[in-house]
Amino acid sequence: MDGEQEARVVALVCSSPPQGYARWSLRLLADQVVQLKIIQDISHETIRQVLEDNELKPWRKQEWCIPPQANAEFVYHMEDILDVYKRPADPKHPLVCFDESPEQLVRETRQAIPMQIGQLERYDYEYQREGVANLFMFFAPLQNWRTVKVTDRRTKTDWAHCMRDLVEIHFPDAETIAVVQDQLNTHSPACLYEVFPPTKAKQILDRLEFHSTPKHGSWLNMAEIEFSVLNRQCLNRCIPSQADLMRETETWASLRNHKQATVNWQFTNKDARIKLIRLYPSIDA
């Protein structure tokens, strides 16, 4: 196979598979290469070598948060968040990243068989759904602190109570709290006036400084990283009830706080203007 033929094979691999197929396989690629007369005859092993040489894995794909192109609104919110992340630690002005996530409650219908020497733990494929709970994550990276609140739902009332807890329980001595959160319709300061008396709502809001991630840019929220850790370390199993979920997440947060675990965020606006230049609108001189 010469260079031109290999380039055509690579282009074929990077295209959509033919109708009736969800993805490319080695043998399907070999058949298509012959049908398209790229080469007279080729084995699936040769195809495998071409894929390996070009670091192509058509059997794999990755879910990704794909941002818009040349979008000033996205850039504005991104640079605002990255500026907030550069602030030094200050107990009077803490940074708190806030996020939420649903959690399916699941009960096993049969007792799992424990792991033994030479044998993996085995569990039955049947399970019983026990409803859905909601998790609110509070994460202060500069204080190496986090906590998880479990609720029935994720309404604007629940969000308003979380903001009250942030001010009155978690950081009662802070003057202002910078809150990084996603752009959701329930994350509106106006919601506090629907839940609390005006005086109370104003007292809470006067101590909060909101910074929203761009739409389709939730990867900028460090609380999402903490949720990823929580899912891997704690939630990747059957948890049957909200009470069990509360106990497990409280224990996880307590142990992680004790270890002073945090996120070492390094990405800056300077990096963004180089690596994510496609997000920035072009300006004619």
Predicted segments, located by residue:
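Extended, low-complexity cationic-aromatic segments
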Residues: 77-164, 276-277
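A short, amphipathic alpha-helix used for macromolecular contacts
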Residues: 1-42, 88-89
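C-terminal domain-tail junction helix/linker
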Residues: 109, 244-285
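Short, basic/hydrophobic alpha-helical segments
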Residues: 157-178
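Active-site proximal helix-loop segment of RNase H-like, two-metal nucleases, encompassing DDE(D)
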Residues: 146, 215, 223-242, 255-259
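Acidic/histidine-rich, metal-coordinating catalytic segments
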Residues: 174-188
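RNase H-like polynucleotidyl transferase catalytic core
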Residues: 122-127, 200-222, 237-241
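Short, basic alpha-helical nucleic acid-contact segments in DNA-binding proteins
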Residues: 49-62
